[in-house]
Amino acid sequence: GIMAGYNTLSKEQLNEELVKLKEEYAKILESDISLDMSRGKPGEDQLNLSMGMMNVLDGNSDYKTTVGFDCRNYGLLDGIPEAKQMMADIMEVSPENVIVFGNASLNIMYDTVSRSFTHGVLGETPWCKLDKVKWLCPVPGYDRHFSITEFFGVEMINVPMNEDGPDMDMVEKLVSEDEAIKGIWCVPKYANPTGVAYSDEVVRRFAALKPAAKDFRIFWDNAYAIHHLY
């Protein structure tokens, strides 16, 4: 075929072939097809084998999302749209800014720290290649947070907790002066173990931080965001 001889064609012939291929590509785009190129996913006939369990209580089981995704199969990377929308409504953010993982937030935080060590954050140097990595730890705080940074050998810096949240004078000073400080643990509402809720002023000061490190991150573990509703 002609593909095997591209290196023998003249410039004019190559241009003609390019025009032809673009026309074929345009026709494919116009056909409005949706192809799932992922591998290892069960077919619909296999998924239907479980319908007896799906329908045992309700014969009208609805397993499709609003965009037609079959929830009986492997999930979407960022979560099904309905779950993203629900969490977006609760957290008052756009669903495009929501990723629905599994139900273990500590795993997400651990994986995020781990990836920062092995691959870096948004193109910055992987933390494993740095001489020193430091972390701000409001105290008293959640011991499971501290165990993550301890596991990676991070130098943890205690920040006193006030009645309205962490000592922000100290936080602002430390992060602005030391680029080795890469993050801070936060439980902004009903902090573990004191039950302190960060004030609006503290939250605004967090949002306005000017860290020396481009890859500084606030780990905002808002686990109890809606508990007051119950």
Where are the regions that the model predicts?
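Walker B catalytic acidic pair
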Residues: 222
